[in-house]
A protein has these predicted regions:
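Membrane-proximal intracellular helices of multi-pass ion channels
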Residues: 1-219
Length: 219
């Protein structure tokens, strides 16, 4: 509920229900929004809104696990509830808190790489960071009403696709591949193979439909 306060007290002046919806949408990386005229909002509020996607992307539970041991509270069950896939029950590091921190390191690293790519691709620094938070978390939020289309840049759209795809992969798998300094874990993972096949198939169907209906002339 407290995450909704900036939307209630800030320039958007949302009611409790709408503000709660907006905050929940960000933290769960749903991407639905009730806010319009994003281009007119203060940059501070836009950054806050994008940061909700960043926090929700890896999972606040994982963040909590990293600090729970300091309070002498176990986090193993929370970690297993928050992670998925074949490496779910694999110990990536000796201690669960170290594993949570390692996954956050991978997550932050991807966000940094994405933000740098967006910035070099022509975005302002705020937009680069904000869209990185959203892309890696697959959260769907943007700092513009036109979303990534605001820039009308095939390069930025391609970068966004790339980092959204990477963000959709099991972060434990990213960590294992990084730790072993090899891409082997990616090629052996059945979950990733299914993910890639589904993404490719759905993309092909959508591209065909868009082309058939002339949504983008010249496509």
């Amino acid at each position: 509920g407290s995450c909704a306060l900036p939307f209630m007290l800030g320039p958007t002046k949302l009611g409790f229900t709408d503000a709660y919806f907006e905050a929940a949408s960000g933290l769960t990386t749903t991407g639905a929004t009730v806010i319009t005229n994003l281009d007119q909002l203060p940059r501070s509020l836009l950054f806050y809104r994008q940061s909700l996607c960043f926090l929700g992307g890896m999972g606040i539970v994982i963040l909590a696990i990293a600090i729970l041991p300091m309070l002498r509270i176990g986090g193993s069950q929370l970690f297993r509830a928050e992670t998925t896939g074949p490496v779910k029950d694999t110990k990536l590091t000796p201690r669960i808190a170290e594993t949570a921190r390692a996954l956050w390191l991978v997550y932050v690293g991807l966000n940094a790489a994405c933000a740098l790519s967006f910035w070099l691709g022509g975005m302002t620094l705020l937009d680069a960071i904000g869209h990185a938070f959203s892309a890696v978390a697959t959260g769907g939020f943007s700092t513009h009403d036109a979303s990534i289309g605001y820039y009308d840049s095939p390069l930025l759209e391609a970068l966004c696709i790339l980092f959204m795809f990477l963000g959709g992969i099991n972060f434990a798998l990213h960590f294992v591949a990084w730790k072993r300094a090899t891409g082997g874990p990616y090629f052996r993972d059945s979950e990733l193979k299914a993910y890639f096949a589904i993404a490719l198939a759905v993309s092909a169907v959508v591209a065909f439909d868009v082309s058939a209906h002339g949504v983008f002339p010249g496509f």
